[in-house]
């Protein structure tokens, strides 16, 4: 029932070339591209400074970085000749569309798996096809053969069930607004405990009975204990992403089977229609509870509870990001750092522009010198560690080894640039620019430095998708089942397309459920009789 949420902020990856030995030290780095307009300047500079090999170190070219999500390269913004700037709205929209399309498959796979588990269970275990016990929220059991009586009974049951859903949703929002996190966590843990232990045990028992597999009670209890404990840890604490996603898919499928089992036939269809309307109101209404939940979580910069949300994303953690205040505090506490960079932006500028690197610090002020040059010909980084040291007979050795003069003239420039890149990739570099981010595993000790990417889909959406397909599968018509399956995926794809265009939380149920209901009844009423008639008359199209 929760809304789909897209965060299409792509983290920048550190780039490097791969045509030298130094490049092998840079793991998983992207490839640098040199702008064509710098080629002539670089050649002129190298030819005019053959007698001064150390001076070529300062001519660091502009860096073109390629985003890891597949977007266009964007130039780092820097002083003194950096021509790059922030991306335009057109590029941002293009990146968002590409990013959303990239994650469609990542969302199709879990939705398809959840529906396949439900369909396979419905067709193999007869326990979930028969309905002899009903939920407490459905007092009208549709025992009458009259269609009108069934219709009003289904309508009344759906209204009662939706009233319970609305009350529970508003209760959850009130608790979240009041920061009653312990109550919410206890509520979710109790629900997960019942699903992972009690309902899973019932599912295992019926599965063993259906396939006539003998198992003693101690073994079954041991399996259930291990399965439930690992699931509780991965959902509510920490665990591998794939494991958490697998448990969420299983929980959604199990809950869908419960609805199929204990809801009357007509009530199930009425609930699907009613829940789609409620999802539309709850997400798009200005005072909708799900919209309030999403906006409050964004304002507080908090995660929505993992037991309610399926996320297709991995965690992109920021490594050693230094704020300007921290840099100034470091500079003021250490006398030896008076000549080092005091802001991350100045460090970025020194790496992005050759004009800024060749200057003596006048473009950014005297308080932000970029590098220190020693008498022995080496250039010091901002931390005081030499980037590279050159010997006086470097070019002579290169010519003796058979290298061309052009290669020797550009050697110092390439080595200096790669040394800068290697030093920037080191995790202990405290002066790293805040524009540099690397894809790492999530750091549990620094949760504040994490940011999320990808698509999020509420578990309620998984549940009701599976209820629709499972209910269609219970009639034994594979044509209707496949039609509902395709309709749900088409509706989900349209929802993701609108999500990438509008860039706000959208309800995931209305389009998919509407398409599914239309395809289900149209296929069972029109397509199935038509195909049976063609098959009886041996007409092949």
Curated annotation (Swiss-Prot):
Transmembrane segments: 107-127, 155-175, 183-203, 217-237, 243-263, 266-286, 454-474, 482-502
A family per Pfam: Presenilin
Topological type in the membrane: Multi-pass membrane protein
EC number: 3.4.23.-
Tissue: Maternally expressed in nurse and follicle cells. In early embryos, expressed in all or most cells and later increases in CNS and epidermal tissues. In larvae, expression is seen in all imaginal disks, brain and optic lobes. In pupae, expression is seen in eye disk and brain.
Keywords assigned: Endoplasmic reticulum, Glycoprotein, Golgi apparatus, Hydrolase, Membrane, Notch signaling pathway, Protease, Transmembrane, Transmembrane helix
Intramembrane stretches: 507-527
Domain-related comment: The PAL motif is required for normal active site conformation.
Functional description taken from the UniProt entry: Probable catalytic subunit of the gamma-secretase complex, an endoprotease complex that catalyzes the intramembrane cleavage of integral membrane proteins such as Notch receptor. Required for S3 cleavage of Notch, which releases activated Notch protein from the cell membrane. Involved in the patterning of the optic lobes.
Protein name (record): Presenilin homolog
Species the sequence originates in: Drosophila melanogaster (Fruit fly)
């Amino acid at each position: 029932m929760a809304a789909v949420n897209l965060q299409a902020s792509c983290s920048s990856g550190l780039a490097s070339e791969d045509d030298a030995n130094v490049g092998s030290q840079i793991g998983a780095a992207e490839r640098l591209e040199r702008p064509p307009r710098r080629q002539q300047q670089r050649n002129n500079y190298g030819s005019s400074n053959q007698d001064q090999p150390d001076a070529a170190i300062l001519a660091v070219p502009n860096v073109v970085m390629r985003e890891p999500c597949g977007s266009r390269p964007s130039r780092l913004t820097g002083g003194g000749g950096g021509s790059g700037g922030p991306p335009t709205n057109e590029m941002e929209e293009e990146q968002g569309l590409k990013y959303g399309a990239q994650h469609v498959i990542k969302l199709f796979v879990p939705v398809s798996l959840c529906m396949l588990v439900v369909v396979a269970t419905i067709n193999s275990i007869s326990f979930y096809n028969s309905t002899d016990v009903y939920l407490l929220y459905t007092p009208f059991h549709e025992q009458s053969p009259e269609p009108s009586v069934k219709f009003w009974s289904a309508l009344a049951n759906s209204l009662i069930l939706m009233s319970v859903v609305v009350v529970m949703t508003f209760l959850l929002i009130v608790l979240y607004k009041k920061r009653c996190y312990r109550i919410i966590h206890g509520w979710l843990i109790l629900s997960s405990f019942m699903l992972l232990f009690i309902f899973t045990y019932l599912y295992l028992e019926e599965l063993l009975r259906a396939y006539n597999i003998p198992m003693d009670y101690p073994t079954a209890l041991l399996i259930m204990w291990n399965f439930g404990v690992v699931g509780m840890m991965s959902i509510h604490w920490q665990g591998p992403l794939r494991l958490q996603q697998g448990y969420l898919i299983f929980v959604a499928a199990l809950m869908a089977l419960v609805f199929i089992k204990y809801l009357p036939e007509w009530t199930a269809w009425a609930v699907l229609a009613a829940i789609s309307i409620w999802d539309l109101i709850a997400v798009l209404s200005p005072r909708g509870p799900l919209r309030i939940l999403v906006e409050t979580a964004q304002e507080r910069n908090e995660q929505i509870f993992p037991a309610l949300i399926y996320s297709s994303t991995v965690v992109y953690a920021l490594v050693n990001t230094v704020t300007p205040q921290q840099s100034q505090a470091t500079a003021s506490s250490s006398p030896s750092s008076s000549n080092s960079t005091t802001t991350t932006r100045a460090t970025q500028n020194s790496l992005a522009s050759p004009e800024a690197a060749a200057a003596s610090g006048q473009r950014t002020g005297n308080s932000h010198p970029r590098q220190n040059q020693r008498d022995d010909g080496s250039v010091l980084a901002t931390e005081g560690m030499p980037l590279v040291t050159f010997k006086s007979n470097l070019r002579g050795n290169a010519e003796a080894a058979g290298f061309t003069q052009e290669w020797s003239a550009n050697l110092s420039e390439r080595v200096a640039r790669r040394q800068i890149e290697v030093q920037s990739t080191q995790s202990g570099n405290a002066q790293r620019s805040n524009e540099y981010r690397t894809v790492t595993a999530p750091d549990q000790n620094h949760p504040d430095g994490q940011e999320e990417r990808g698509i999020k889909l509420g578990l309620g959406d998984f549940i009701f998708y599976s209820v629709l397909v499972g209910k269609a599968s219970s009639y034994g018509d594979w044509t209707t089942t496949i039609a509902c399956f395709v309709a749900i995926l088409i509706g989900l794809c349209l929802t993701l397309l609108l999500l990438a265009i509008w860039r706000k939380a959208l309800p995931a149920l209305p389009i998919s459920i509407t398409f599914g209901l239309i395809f289900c009844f149209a296929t069972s009423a029109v397509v199935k009789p038509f195909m049976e008639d063609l098959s009886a008359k041996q007409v092949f199209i």
